[in-house]
A protein has these predicted regions:
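Interdomain/boundary linker segments immediately adjacent to catalytic/signaling cores
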Residues: 1-39
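Short glycine-rich, low-complexity/disordered patches
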Residues: 19-29, 42-47, 143-150
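Short, well-structured alpha-helical interface segments that form or flank functional binding sites
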Residues: 21, 25, 29, 73, ...
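A short acidic/basic microdomain associated with nuclease active sites
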Residues: 35-71, 77-79
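A short catalytic or substrate-binding loop motif that flags glycine-/basic-rich loops and adjacent residues
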Residues: 70-73, 226-228
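Active-site beta-strand-loop-beta-strand hairpin of nuclease catalytic cores
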Residues: 71, 76-92, 97
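Catalytic cores of nucleic-acid endonucleases
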Residues: 94-161
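Non-catalytic C-terminal interaction segments of nucleic acid-processing enzymes
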Residues: 144-147, 151, 155-243
């Protein structure tokens, strides 16, 4: 499995006229499409992982009770196992614009995509997914697995993600996902010390990441009038660090 395969599947959704209403809708359809691929053996949704050393896998296999109440759990949207025994991790984001819009889906009729806005926060969260995928082989899953590649995916009808450099916000300037910019790498600063921003720790990316946006090419009549925005999507490939 590779980035081109994911792009092909998502392009197929557009060709079939699929309009998603939320992230869970998108996640389920992508999981189903991946499961139907010849080279895919299994797909796990919302796979939990824990810090190394939080519990002993052999003890659990032998029936020893364990608790995860006080350890930092993380959930990966999709873990894909291919027929050659390799594992891949996918993190998804589906983000609406700053107002709700109604679309026509070939499969379900009218579909409402509600507003999200907050592009700065959500761009941070997308890059945090990239950071988590870099570190994923330092996590402990219920099965002793090693992730071969990670993929961070964003599908949106908000053009600010692909066009804005966040130039009006010194706080989030380094978190723009705009295409064509210099590769993201290293420490990404958050230029504010206000209390409401303290929950957002600066990210430090090991890899170098550029953002190649793709149009999600629905038929023109999917947009009920010319004021309704189209969709675009981003697939970023991540090499997990060895631990």
């Amino acid at each position: 499995m590779n980035r081109d395969k994911l792009i092909s599947i998502i392009n197929g959704f557009a060709k079939d006229g699929k309009v998603f209403s939320n992230e869970q809708d998108f996640q389920f359809e992508l999981a189903l499409a991946l499961k139907n691929e010849v080279e895919v053996e299994q797909v796990k949704l919302e796979a939990a992982s824990f810090p190394q050393g939080s519990w002993n896998l052999d003890d659990i296999r032998n029936g020893k009770p364990f608790s995860v109440d006080k350890v930092q759990k993380e959930y990966t949207d999709l873990i894909v196992k291919t027929t050659d025994g390799l594992y891949y991790a996918i993190e998804l984001k589906f983000k609406g614009a700053d107002k709700p819009y109604l679309y026509k889906s070939m499969a379900f009729g009218n579909v409402a995509v509600l507003k999200h806005g907050a592009e700065h926060f959500n761009a941070y969260r997308f890059l945090n997914d990239v950071s988590r995928l870099e570190r994923i082989n330092g996590r402990l899953f219920a099965n002793d697995i090693r992730i071969e590649k990670g993929y961070a995916v964003l599908l949106t009808n908000n053009s600010k993600y692909k066009e804005s450099d966040f130039g009006g916000s010194e706080i989030w300037r380094e978190y723009s996902l705009r295409g064509g910019q210099k590769a993201k790498h290293g420490l990404l600063r958050i230029r504010n010390s206000e209390k409401k921003y303290l929950a957002f720790e600066p990210l430090n990316l090991n890899g170098y990441y550029t953002f190649e946006w793709n149009d999600y090419k629905l038929e023109p009549d999917a947009m009920l009038n010319d004021k309704i925005p189209g969709f675009s999507f981003l697939v970023v490939e991540v090499d997990p660090q060895e631990n």
